[in-house]
UniProtKB/Swiss-Prot annotation:
Family (UniProt): Belongs to the bacterial ribosomal protein bL33 family.
Protein name according to UniProt: Large ribosomal subunit protein bL33A
Signal peptide: none
Biological processes, Gene Ontology terms: translation
Gene3D superfamilies, sorted: Ribosomal protein L33 (2.20.28.120)
């Protein structure tokens, strides 16, 4: 089993456009201790929007 304080946990990125679309990725806690924000494509609104880490 994985440790609770895994260095690279799996995080869910949720669209800020309000569509409910999500990406699943991993992040390195040592390099990115804050919540992750990436600009990615949301196919529901057909444009690039910010995706924020949802906990």
């Amino acid at each position: 089993m994985a440790r609770q304080t895994d260095v690279r946990p799996i995080v869910r990125l949720r669209s800020t456009a309000g569509t409910g679309y999500t990406y699943v990725t991993r992040k390195n806690r040592r390099n990115d201790p804050d919540r992750l924000v990436l600009r990615k494509y949301d196919p529901i609104v057909r444009q690039h929007v910010e995706f924020r880490e949802a906990r």
